[in-house]
A protein has these predicted regions:
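Active-site nucleotide/adenylate-binding loops and adjacent lid/helix of ATP-dependent enzymes
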Residues: 1-72, 93-94, 127-131
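ATP-dependent carboxylate/phosphate-activation module, predominantly the ATP-grasp catalytic core
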Residues: 43-46, 50-53, 75-141, 165-190
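Flexible, glycine/charged-enriched surface loops at secondary-structure junctions
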Residues: 72, 145-147, 196-201
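Glycine-biased flexible loop/turn sites that connect beta-strands or occur in inter-domain linkers
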Residues: 95, 156-157
Length: 252
């Protein structure tokens, strides 16, 4: 099976503050579409509550507005941004996984409404983890793109899955730039109805949306920083904000 953080589903009016796991806890809306329709002062994409008092304060703030769906409460897994992983997959019309690209997150965004969005990634290969998720997707006959947020838990040496997004992720250019053009998979599978071979990304590639200097400064693991520098020197680097053709013909 798949490992995931201990979780509690909290509904409006629920008085529970003691869970089967300790504080701190993560708080996030179960219906993000509805949540973002009703902005409020102090609104965050996700929250960390250090204790019961802070938990009550945060949940009261969320439910004081028009959001009325449930909240997902999860055990907080320790570790900085570099403990995160992201896996993007494509399953064809026959529910067979045809592309897998795992990213080792180096940095995430830290503004309140964007917290958790990936800002720098190196692709990596983890056969055991990827095979687990491949089996899961095929067992449930999943079709289309899937995007998994994962964090390594040093307490038990397991990779815990936070969620599956039924789409490509915001940072999906880490997939295309490393040699797995996501648009081609859809066209070949759904329009041309070709049979695709399974492609698993094994070679490391560096993608980022923040300047390299920010990565060098804020990534705490210097082995990862050295790996980034090596990939840059090898030309295995891409950024979503750097596309030379954007400026073609604009300068003489």
């Amino acid at each position: 099976g798949l490992d995931y953080p201990k979780t509690y589903i909290f509904s409006k009016g629920d008085k529970t503050t003691d869970f089967k796991f300790d504080y701190p806890v993560i708080i996030k809306p179960s219906d993000s579409v509805l949540y973002w329709q009703f902005p409020f002062e102090g609104m965050n994409k996700a929250y960390v509550a250090k204790d019961k008092d802070e938990f009550i304060e945060i949940t009261n703030k969320i439910y004081s507005g028009k959001y009325n769906k449930s909240l997902i409460i999860q055990d907080f897994i320790p570790g900085d941004d570099s403990y995160m992983r992201v896996l993007t997959c494509y399953s064809d019309r026959n529910a067979k996984v045809k592309m897998m690209c795992l990213g080792h997150v180096l940095l995430e965004e830290h503004t309140p409404t964007a917290i958790g969005n990936h800002a720098a990634i190196i692709t990596e290969f983890n056969e055991e983890l990827m095979n687990k998720i491949k089996t899961f997707l095929e067992d449930i006959n999943y079709v289309g793109f899937s995007n998994f947020d994962i964090k390594y838990d040093s307490r038990d040496n397991k990779y815990k899955l936070f969620e599956i997004n039924l789409r490509q992720g915001r940072s999906n250019y880490y997939v295309t730039s490393s040699g797995n053009n996501i648009a081609k998979y859809v066209v070949k599978d759904r329009i041309l109805e070709k049979n695709l071979d399974l492609k698993v990304q094994k070679e490391p590639f560096y993608w980022h949306v923040v300047p390299n200097a920010v990565v060098f400064k804020y990534v705490k693991d210097k082995e990862l920083v050295n790996k980034v520098k090596k990939l840059i020197s090898q030309g295995k680097e891409a950024t979503s904000f750097g596309y030379n053709r954007d400026l073609e013909g604009n300068f003489k």
